[in-house]
Amino acid sequence: FHYRAAETAAKYKLMVDFHGTYKPTGLNRTYPNVINYEAVHGLEQMKWSDIHTDQVTYDVTMPFIRMLAGPVDYTQGAMHNANKRCYHSSMDTPMSQGTRCRQLAEYVVFESPLNMLCDSPTNYDREEECTEFIATIPTVWEQTIAMNGEIGKYITMARRKGDVWYVGSLTLSLIHIS
């Protein structure tokens, strides 16, 4: 399916984002129109995840493992956020674990040429500063530097587009980095 879809899309000069599929295996080298793969426990999973799901730890682990295979269609950008103690699954008002700033940092840390929005448009209307940042952040970078990190604890990435640098950092909820 993937090869046929990529080939057909290329024939018609269309880009492909394989959402809900396995990790990249090199198909995008043959078909550069394939720009993204999900293959992660993306944020939409939090709608039905139970209180034992630790998305914060997952988010500081995934870049070291899954992202090595290629771009990630993660669906970040939740505007309704809670700490682990207050988090609960909800189909009506889904939320993320962590903070809104954490959600914004994921746009820098996670490599994704086609970023998604996981939340309701009305939530973005209420958070104008966040929405402006998401709308203007580049999705393709000229330079990337992994500044520091430890699997499952923290990660800091710096990415440059033109003369502008963006720095994003994700940590565990209770970690202190000196």
What are these model-derived regions, one by one?
Residues 175-177:
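Conserved small/polar residues in nucleotide/adenosyl-binding loops
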Residues 93, 102-121:
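Catalytic domains of carbohydrate-active enzymes that cleave complex glycans
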Residues 16, 109, 167:
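Conserved, mostly hydrophobic/aromatic
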Residues 13-20, 43-48, 115-127, 141-145:
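Acidic/polar loop patches that form or flank catalytic/metal-binding clefts of enzymes
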Residues 2, 9, 98-102, 127, ...:
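Active-site-proximal structural scaffolding
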